[in-house]
Amino acid sequence: MEDLSNQNLLPRQSDISIPAEKMDSFQKSLEPPPCSPVKSSQQSETEVTPPQKPPLHQFGHNQVQKNRVSNQDPSTSRRHNEVESKENTPNKQQKHCNCKNSKCLKLYCECFASGSYCNGCNCVNCHNKLENESSRQVAISGILERNPDAFKPKIAGSPHGMKDLQENVQQVLLIGKHSKGCHCRKSGCLKKYCECYQANILCSENCRCQDCKNFEGSEERKALLHGSQVSDTYIQQMTNAAVNRAIDMSAYLYPPESRKRKSKDISDSVVSSYGVQYQRANHVRRNGENSLFSLPNNKAVSGSTTSAYRSSWSNTFQPHHVRELCSLLVSNSVDVANKLSDKGRKNDKGPSSLDGAQRVANEINDSPDCVLDANRMDEKPISPATRALMCDEEHEIGSEKETSARVKTSQEKEDTDTSSGIYLEQERQILSIFRDYLIQLSNRARINGKNIKSNTNPS
């Protein structure tokens, strides 16, 4: 019934009459506008742009960075944006990780720390992928709670970027800075495993390196950056520096007055490994100061008087002097031994012979066999008193033997003492002769040095 009532209420098509002109205008308004040959920006972007890389980290750390940048000056924020845009260039190759047990969710995973998904890596059980985004975000949030600056780069990029190694070093402005600093010990910060050198930046006050050569004005760093163009001059400089140190160590041969003049006037020459003799004008300066390159031979250095260095020991100590010294020491030691042995024989000759004869006679007369023979010849009975006297004599004989043994040991000690005395006297004589010879040799060297100095500087 309701349907019938609705049908009755609706007007019929035959009852409604619309003019043809109005119908045409209405249909034209319903038609879509004609398509322009120029495509819209959204369509062009979707058709032209290739598939982009997977997105970076999407966490609250970007918000913290935005807040920090907003507090800074607009110039610094503009520079920061320029640096990030230059560092994230598509030409930069992504490193591949080799994680085994970390699931690529730790900071020592290079892909995870850089904010990119693993793609073509050699990792095992990897969770740094788009399929595991939930676990990835949980790991990121946990790391940021412990350290809000965990995903910041260690080295702030330089707006100048990486320069060509063959370019002039003075024109390269290295503004980057390591946030934690390097800890090099033996490389001099000139190897690839130094993070500052690898990023082409100079070491800063944050670094804890030892014997650092990665500073502004370092000759070693310039030689590495320039490559083969400066290798010859660098070798030449290092040779001159080594020779200068060696010559300075030998300055004790000169008196104090000549040392000062030597450091000012006399410059040294050395034959390098290439067979060319070089001269130096000034000492090598440190801490990045410009050092003079040594000039080839037969070229005068402006502003300094040059002369070839000649040691004062030249033509002073010859091999025959060594032979003479050795023969002198040996002959003197033999003479000392003969003299002391002759003196000992003369002192012990008289009393020793007398003592020997007396000892033999006493031993014969005081022997118990002799006493028994005398008693047998008498063949008389021995009284107790005589027996007591005989016992006393036996004790005396034993004491005399002990004294004779003591005399023998004392004589042996005297012999050893005399031999040690001979050795001591020989040592004393040899040392005194050697000392006198060294004094004589030093006097010769001093005289020779004065002659060389007078010949080189006649004024």
UniProtKB/Swiss-Prot annotation:
Keywords, comma-separated and alphabetical: Developmental protein, Metal-binding, Nucleus, Zinc
Cellular location(s): Nucleus
Region of interest called Disordered, as start-end residue ranges on this chain: 1-96, 340-362, 395-420
Domain CRC: 93-217
GO CC annotation: nucleus
Main location, first listed in the record: nucleus
A single GO molecular function term of this UniProt record: metal ion binding
InterPro entries listed in its UniProt record: CRC, Lin-54_fam, Tesmin/TSO1-like_CXC
UniProt biased composition (Basic and acidic residues): 79-89, 340-349, 395-413
Matching Pfam families: TCR (PF03638)
Compositionally biased region (Polar residues): 1-16, 38-49, 60-75
Family matches, as PROSITE patterns: CRC
Domain-level remarks: The cysteine-rich domain CRC binds zinc in vitro.
Family per similarity comment: Belongs to the lin-54 family.
Primary role: Plays a role in development of both male and female reproductive tissues.
Protein name in UniProt: Protein tesmin/TSO1-like CXC 7
Organism: Arabidopsis thaliana (Mouse-ear cress)
Lineage: Eukaryota, Viridiplantae, Streptophyta, Embryophyta, Tracheophyta
